[in-house]
Amino acid sequence: MNNARRVALDFETIVNAFDVMGRYLRDQCGVVGEIAVYGGTAMLLQFPWRKMTEDVDVTILTGERESAVKDAAAFAAVRLGLPDDWLNNYVGGFTPETESQAFFSTFGVYPRGEAPGLRVFLAKPEYLCAMKLKALERESVDDRDFEDAVNLALEIGIDTVDHLKQLFTSFFPGETLHSSALARLPELAEKIQLRRPG
């Protein structure tokens, strides 16, 4: 089993894995699967400042094809020497009860340049930032969630506590940020303002 070791995944490794998955879904299953990508991978695939991630957090959008998508991910793990859980659906605790298609952008179809077997959608930067605000309630390695929130806020152009709260509420209506996350918003806004260009 290759579960025990962690591998740093970069852009090329991830899109190569999507190619393998797409070919498998098309050729072995005769279907087109769809996944929505979140977290570090969604940032890595959209921005040059995120270079690596440990895994690919997804939801499988084609529920009737869930087992085929999981089989394709397992096949890609074996083919490319990736950990068994390189693609996982552990993201549920940080998503709202209902997600709109407007929260996502189309990233691509795989395999690249061939008949498709996999469609990949990415969480938009605004949605990722709201999710990172929610994640501030927990501690993360090297305070990664905080740093990601700073970078995402810079990308979308918000830099005040009020704007951060409004952003969170727009994606998580009816929810309030945990007190530990709320307590970090002034520090977050200050860091965003310090790093803002110009």
Question: Which residue ranges define each predicted feature?
Answer:
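Compositionally biased terminal segments of proteins
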Residues: M1-G198
